[in-house]
Amino acid sequence: MRFHSRILLLITCLLCTAIAFSQVKITGKVVDNSGQPIEFATVRLLGTAVGTNTDTKGDYEMTVPKADTLMVEFSCLGYSTVTRQLIKPEGTVTINPKLYEKTLELEGVEITEYKKQTTGMQGIDVEMLKRTPDASGGSVEAVLTTMAGVSSKNEMSSQYMVRGGSYDENSVYINGIEVYRPQLISSGQQEGMSIINPDMVRKVDFSTGGFSAAYGDRMSSVLDITYREPEAFEGAFAASMQGGSLMLGHSTRHYSQMHGVRYKRNSSLMGSLESKGEYDPQYFDYQTSLVFKPMDKLRIALLGNVSINDYRFTPKNRETSFGTSEDVKQFTVYFDGYEKDKFQTYFGAGSVTYLFNDKGTDLTLQASGYRTDELVAYDIHGEYWLDQAGQELGVGKYHEHERTRLKMNVMDLTLRGNVGINQNSISYGISMRKEDIYDRSRQWQWRDSAGYSLPHIPDQVNVIFTESSSNDLKTTRIAGWLMDTWRFTSGVGYWSLNAGIRLSHWNFNKETLVSPRVSLGFVPERNGNLSLRLSGGVYYQAPFYKEYRQQLLDELGNRTILLNKDIKSQRSIQVILGSDYTFRALDRPFKFTAEAYYKNLSNLIPYEIDNLKLVYSGINSSKGYIAGLDMKLFGQFVEGTDSWISFSLMKTQEDLYGVKVPRPTDQRYSIAMFFTDYFPNIPRLKFSLKGVLSDGLPTTAPHLTRADSYVRQPAYKRVDVGLSYELVGKDNRPLSGFLSHFKEIWLGLDCFNLMDISNVSSYYWVTDVNNIQYAVPNYLTRRQLNVRLSASF
């Protein structure tokens, strides 16, 4: 019996050896012309059914039968097909093909096909950022606000809302590192510039929901930015009526550096606001990105940022007309006082990455630090009149005072890695974050209407509102995640499955969170133009500074801010179903995208929106839901230029103190368009248009909630247009002289708010002696022209 077993084992070994020697393993990485990996590329052996697909790192591996000659084909939608011939291959063969973007020529116009999307992340063309008319000064977020499900209500701000979420529910990453924005910003005038420098951006990925476990505890969206690494000496500069920017980059074999400086003054734009006075805003931003590669498998990267926003305003007067054509009211104010705000942020990060092999196995140790020093200080006194057709409705005085100082330090240490195993890509990480917060604030408001101090108490003179805070806090957060992306091909089509889990703990409230997330993408074999996506999971909004500041009232109505140690993370259980369909119409490519979503919300911390300021209750006292449908048609409406139109329907509601009310972000509909064109006889003259029509948001009077009462703002309507003329380009670049050193030079003219529509950002509430309140709209900017010059070299 033992003899027969040995014979059987010997035969099995011989057969396995024969099979092994009769097969060839083919591995490698598929990249584009810039060296970036291409995911979802098809690798197949011609003449057989053997094939595979690349993973998220562009890597592939397959075993094929041995033959004298093998033909291996590499293809991907939007790229040219490459074929490699192998003559008598043996053992393991490595092929690293480079695919070039596939274009068609129609009368000299290039038309590029569109890639399939099997995950919740969508890519955004960086080139579109350069010539987009943007009143905020040229930000990445300006393009985002035209995407389905994304909206903004203030053209001077780079903040945005996604699918019923607030400004605080969006996370932003630069080179894999989470970045933050100032916390005390309450208006677009104060904000300045986005932390993202568009001149330094190489890649933009954006998710409106259903993102993976690798991203932190936010409920709404992820904006993932990757900065470029210069290939040689290069630079870019821009100047306009709003400000200017300069970027310089340099590269050697083992080292690359990039530096960007931006300066902005919005005086001309703010001059169109109804509050007249001396606006003196100054915004400065410096960023640097350094990369060292002492060896092929080792990469050391440094990222730094200094941002200083200095906003000064001396108001003089304001005249606002509002109401209907048959009921016009006039609000007039004469001011005396001064506002001085300063926001200083400093950010630095360093990472060391070691690449173990060409299969995408790497390990990164990353450390980052963020510091913000914010000051809001104003003393403004005013006398106002409210008239209706010559009849005086109210007259009075008011005084507003605030001194708020916030200092915050956030230190983060992260260890993360990736492991490539066949068709699986495993990602993992663990992080520890320490937060140190210093908060001092005192603010009050006093009003006198028709000679009476409000609130009117005969033997006292009281302010209408007072609030103070004095808090110091040091906390630690720990998080970890593990996820796997599995891409494979079956008889019915191509599949992409991502499943992961994220764990986090915060020592302030002793809360531990478990966040499972999963997404599935499918491209049917019978219809390669169609792709389907299904994603879902449990997402949390971990409280950060503003959310757990709780207001406590004493017997005199004074408010004191305390930190709520019983606060819990807001929770969102999400399900998202989406599809893409690519097609050609008029011999041009188009892609139609539709996504339906539902979010069950619990442990909500109610808040109200005043312009850009979110005022939280500081307690978990609400629950609700968000449901909606997003649609987008993307394509070349004009040959050779990409445009799109998006349409969104959404409903969000919450149970607030026993009353069902719309949430502050209840934007029931939104239509947005980004359109590009060129003049046929002057192809160097480009035209771009950005238009938005979105429903108004519910709002309420100060110190009240929507459970008491609310009004809905008018719809936000805005159209911005821009003309750009190419002075120097790849087809008209001089061979000698000064201009020969430039790659591109563009001269542009923008018209912001083409229709000169007065949009409402918030309301100023006036109360007369009879305690009747009038909502006086605070209008945003009117029509403005902007001239800009940009160049790259």
Residue ranges and their predicted role:
Residues 402, 406, 410-414, 568, ...:
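Outer membrane beta-barrel strand-and-loop segments of large Gram-negative receptors
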Residues 317, 525-574, 589, 596-616, ...:
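Surface-exposed extracellular loop regions of Gram-negative outer-membrane beta-barrel proteins
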Residues 362-368, 374-378, 566-620, 625, ...:
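Membrane-embedded beta-barrel scaffold of Gram-negative outer-membrane proteins
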Residues 692-700, 725-793:
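C-terminal beta-signal and adjacent terminal beta-strands/loops
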Residues 490-492, 597-600, 617-701:
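Gram-negative outer-membrane beta-barrel transporters
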Residues 80, 93, 115-170, 176-211, ...:
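Periplasmic N-terminal accessory/gating domains of Gram-negative outer-membrane beta-barrel systems
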Residues 293-309, 337-509, 593-596, 644:
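Face-selective signature of the C-terminal outer-membrane beta-barrel domain
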Residues 31-34, 41-46, 73-80, 89-133, ...:
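Short, acidic, small-residue-rich periplasmic hinge/interaction motif at the N-terminus
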